[in-house]
Amino acid sequence: MPIKSRIRSIPDYPKKGIMFRDITTLIKDPVGFRLVIDSLTQRYLENGVDFDMIVGIEARGFIIGGALSYTLGKGFVPVRKPGKLPADVVSQEYELEYGSDKIEIHMDALEKGTRVLLVDDLLATGGTALAAAALVEKVGGVVAEMAFIVNLPDVGGEQKIRDKGYSIYSLTDFEGD
């Protein structure tokens, strides 16, 4: 069962001209969800990427990152929208495919030198992922790799992230469609 075939495409959401790739159809299917987590688990057990912690980006990055943390025996750190974390935070603004936003992480989330796998559901412009990477680095962490279910290479985020020197991995690409 290809992962791509389980992802719903919604035109003109959240605004006209955007083709939204909805992973809820993938993760509601227990076979599809297991395939995602098993595929990522296998990659990180076998590929030699060294990391200590998983950092997941709100909200869908929590779903994938939490399950992956469990299967790999790693801790999980959330990157959240403003006002959702109870202790002292560091913030980072960023641009989206369809606007701008801000995310936060606890100031004490990572110890200096902690290597992290940064996880989210989808890579489009790269703005959210780069903002999360900046947060990880602000609190002393090091991004070992970024992992996504879906990559939209035509939007340019993959190249932008690679140009900044980060390694990325995605399970499937939606190119030109």
Curated annotation (Swiss-Prot):
Catalytic activity: AMP + diphosphate = 5-phospho-alpha-D-ribose 1-diphosphate + adenine
Listed EC numbers: 2.4.2.7
Pathway(s) the chain acts in: Purine metabolism; AMP biosynthesis via salvage pathway; AMP from adenine: step 1/1
GO molecular function: adenine binding; adenine phosphoribosyltransferase activity; AMP binding
Signal peptide limits: none
Compartments it resides in: Cytoplasm
A Pfam match: Pribosyltran
Gene Ontology terms: biological process: adenine salvage; AMP salvage; purine ribonucleoside salvage
GO cellular component: cytoplasm
Principal place of residence: cytoplasm
Disulfide-bonded cysteines: none
Root EC class: transferase
CDD domains for the chain: PRTases_typeI
Alphabetized InterPro entries for the sequence: Ade_phspho_trans (IPR005764), PRibTrfase_dom (IPR000836), PRTase-like (IPR029057), UPRTase/APRTase (IPR050054)
Alphabetized UniProt keyword annotations: Cytoplasm, Glycosyltransferase, Purine salvage, Transferase
Family designation: Belongs to the purine/pyrimidine phosphoribosyltransferase family.
Job description of the protein: Catalyzes a salvage reaction resulting in the formation of AMP, that is energically less costly than de novo synthesis.
Subunit structure: Homodimer.
Record-given protein name: Adenine phosphoribosyltransferase
GN (gene name): apt
